[in-house]
Each structure stands twice: as structure tokens, then as C-alpha cells.
Amino acid sequence: MMLKDNILEYVPKRPCPVASCCFATPAEPVDVKALIPDANLRRRMGPLLRLAAACGMSALENVDTGNVAGIITSTGLGFMKDTVSFADMLIDRNEEMLNPSPFMQSTFNTVSGYIALLGGIRTYNTAYVHRSGGFAAALTDAMMLVEDTGRNVLAGGFDEASPEVDEYRRKLGCWKRGDFLPLGEGAGFLCLGGGDNGVRILGVHSSCHTLEFDRKVLCSSYIDRLGAFFSILPVVLCIVIGQRPEGRILVVDDVNPSGPAVLLEID
């Protein structure tokens, strides 16, 4: 791992295999009921939490959960709707008689915690939050853990579209090219490690804007399908892996300022 000019570069000692992956969006969901069979649990979860947790469980569907060394998630903004709801409640009720549900569902590690509970996985569990840069850190951490343990590690990212996120991005001018880009949401998870099934990660670069590469897949080419959000890169990675283009492909988050890039090798 190397840090130069505040840009993180990580190249694993050996190419890191991708055992499986899954992405989910409101328009292209996974089967939440099958992956989270407890109806009471589903009812207590917000829409994005259900979607992201089910997406993570789907990526682990054909993996021995006893061989999972860690669950590492990332998010740009987390659950803004629940965060604002809890903050408003604190003010309106003068910090008394608070409903704990919005707080529990607003914490950044809620998704990784639910995946661990659903899969009975009692191992390393953490979340990275830094706009689009969180996924580069999460994926780097996951690959280092695969190298250290030789076991599977789940890594992914998620973000929501809500009025709160829309207000935030308009104030900061995020995702604007002339006019504002359509707002999107979704989750993408990759299960790393295990046997080589023909998909490998060769490296992570936390700022794609300094990179030149012959074969690039730009996240901006998926805006019409996905919309714009901080965690678009893990979703596009899963889509590209599902298409199985052969060779080395650099998947670039050019939607977000200083967005990261991931170099894949597929055969």
C-alpha cells in the first residue's frame, strides 16, 4: 500500500480472486424475502437497509460463512433519512422519550451488522465512510485481510436516494454537469478470496483522474440506468463482472470528485 499526494494506491501481493458478487437497486432488486425470511425483521428495516443486507447475503449465498474472515462495508452518506429523523426527534422532544429505531437504523455499520447477524458470522466487522473514497478503503482493507488469512472477506458499498440527500447534493453542487444528474441509490457487494474462478482484482487507486488505461469502463456510462450516488463504483463493478469481458479492465468512478478506480482481470 502506498500513500502519495493523499492518493491511496494498493496492489495486492497476488491478484485477489472474486468468489462472487451481487448488486441491487430499487429497479433491479434481489429477492429480499428469500434472503431475509424473518418477516418481523424485514418490517423493522428501512428500504435501503433491507436492500443492502439482502444484497450482501446474496453475495454470500454459495460461500461457507464459517470461512468468512470479515465483513467490510462503505457508504458515502449512510442513512440520511433516518439520521435527519432522529436529529429532528432530539430537538422536537427535548432529548426525552425518544424512539430508538431511527438511531439504530442511521448508524453507518448497520448493514454490516445485519449481515453478520443473518449469516451468524462473528468476525472482523467494520464500515468506512468518506463519500466515494470509502469504498477504496473498504476494498483495500478486504484484500489485505484476504492476504493475511487466506479466507473469504465480504466487501461492499451502499447509498440511498432521499429528499435529504437531494437537498445535501444541491447545496454542495454534487453530481452536476450543467444540470444536476438524476439521483440514484443501490448496493454492491463482492466476496473476495477462495478459489480462482476467473475474476481477480489487481489493484485499487483512490483517485481515478490521474490514470490512463487502454480499456476503461466509466461509471458515468451507467447514469441513465443507475443514477448518480457516492457508492456507484461497487454496483458497476458487479455489473461488469457479470458481463465477463475478457482481459484487464479499469473500472473508473468518474461520477464523483476524485472517485476511485479498480483494476480487474477477467478470463
Range-by-range predicted roles:
Residues 139:
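Short-chain dehydrogenase/reductase
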Residues 1-129, 133-136, 144-151, 155-267:
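Conserved "HGTGT" condensation-loop signature of ketosynthase/thiolase-family condensing enzymes
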